[in-house]
Amino acid sequence: MSAPVITKELIAKHGLTDEEYARIQGILGRDPNITELGVFSVMWSEHCSYKNTKRELRKFPTTGPLVLVKAGEENAGVIDIGDGWAVAFKMESHNHPSAIEPFQGAATGVGGIIRDIFTMGARPVFSLDSLRFGPIHGDTEQHKWNRSRFAGVVSGIAHYGNCIGVPTIGGEVFFDESYNGNPLVNVFCLGILKHEQIARGAAKGVGNPVFYVGAETGRDGLAGAAFASRDLTEESKQDRPAVQVGDPFREKLLLEACLELLATDAVAGIQDMGAAGLTCSTCETASRGGTGVEIDLAKVPQRETGMTPYETLLSESQERMLIIVKKGHEQTVVDIFEKWDLPYAEVGVVKDDGMMRVLDHGKLAVEIPAAKLADDAPLYSREWKARPEPAPLDLSALAAVDEKAALLKLLAHPTIASKQWVWRQFDHMVRLGCAVLPGSDAAVFIVREADKILAATSDCNSLYVLQDPREGARIAIAEAARNLTCSGARLLAVTDNLNFANPHNPELFWQLRESVEGLAEGCREFGTPVTGGNVSLYNQSPAGPIDPTPTVGMVGIIDDAKHITTQAFKSAGDVIILAGPVLDPAAGDLSLGASHYVKVVHGRKAGRTPRLSFDLEKRVQAAVLGLIRDGLVKSAHDCSEGGLAVALAESCIGGKLGATVELPSGPALDKYPAHAARAALLFGESQSRIILGIAPENADRVLAALAAAKIPHSRLGTVGGDKLSITAHGATLAAPLAEVSDPFEHSIERAMEG
């Protein structure tokens, strides 16, 4: 068969511009063949090269005394946790595949991030998920589509994680109309390793053999990286072949075989085959090693016949690795992979010429300078245009509503409601390390082999980011830190997943720029370096762009098991104390702007994002963590979506205890309509607030400590009884605990199961 002629149409179909094609011609000194065009297409896609965002990502702080492997150096960052132990962790997205094939898209997202972790030499110990979908309550075709995506994604995550034995122990699920045509599936994984076990993905040692190990290559996932670098359209369902198919049982074998091999002295370098498959693993290892790699596709294990070099190189079949083996240790690889009944083949050799050279049955198919391919994609500074600041809320125009009905409606909203329908599908007790059941402020996991207790969370309120990208991103960092603090952890580091729409739209690219600035500022304030992450662009469908969603994954460490703290109230008679302001007096919208109350109860995305003071936030968190370490705190809960009323309800529901609370008011609220003042006290989303449950004998000591730290604080009430009663601005909201619990615990289940 004759080779295709490279035309302008073919170049455009591969997602390359005329200027990029001219750059390729300059690198090669000739026209590329069709296989080389495909190779450049995937490696220079946004998914692999970050060509639209790399200049922005350089704003992140990436260094610190605990950083052992920095962002961008390897497949995942690595952080020192003491006593010779370290953690490798990262967050990745599988958004586009999950929109087309939710089960396989989500499942292979889990498999991919797990491979990133064990490629570093770490044993994966747990994962988290940050998921976004359109509304699921309703009978329209869109609601049905959203439910099918939600069900498929959760089932795919559960299938892969449960089968491979890596527990999913937490995360977040957010529902909003902006995700109607484009759900988001962000997956976080963390692994544990000793310092000396850190593995590198570099092709070192000229003459060292290159081994392919793992599943055979097929045509699934063909050019998946390029698929993930364009908008979803009505025709995207035709891209179903670009969605990979995963086998968690095969990956479990691959994990164990690779860790066993890494424990020997046989490995010079190791790289998983994720996005761009064999292409990416070959050129990246060569580029990192400052060497060349030559492989012959005739030696690559294949499960389909008649595959072309183009298909073999661009396939994203799962559960595959590339290993650079120290010469003379080939038999070690053979013995281990035969033991684990996994395919393997010696497919090439490390060269000294800096080239990625691919043969097909001895015939030259690809010859490209590896560093140019892996590291020299064009970088763009996209045009941006700031959006005008949103108008403040007209509080006098907010209709008066029944506050009890509003609370029940908020508790029933799937973003706020219990995610037990999701959690019960996950075997979160695999490895017996899950110390806090899913649903509290952060996941807590005991790593017994290292005698360490880790905490992790994922956070982002996209309503905040939509209204003010920089402030919303600052709050995402602060809330992640607050969730870890409420669990008794000190902060370590951050990974992120930047989910945005089309970067060629100036207003949408401005959202990304501002969000990066906010994340970077937050990380500097909390001393949490960014260890790596993912950028996912082109998240928009015919329904429109998603709301900007810079998801934060943050990791902390709990120094003593006695410090593990949860959000549930513990005992009748305990005193409820608020660390932080009841209401931010400087908030022009009374902290109702961009709130879930305004969205869910009044049906609007409106107003200004709450303001965040890093100074106050850090003082509140430091004081609360100190109180936890002093043994004075029985429960701690971050106050976020839905405000104080929702946070109090969650602590009551978790502890199966009622509460009687009075929220302090003041003359500053008298200038507002009474119903607006009550709404602000109950449902406003002022920042830097933590609800504490304190034994009565310790209440005065806690209040004195907060006063000494010059932190706004209030004694709100007591735990006990069988109802939740909250008095605010002269009126009382009261409901039996059973009535409060029902919508919270069963809303998602009713939507999904009828």
Where are these regions (language model features)?
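Glycine/proline-enriched, intrinsically flexible loops and inter-domain linkers
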Residues: 1-754
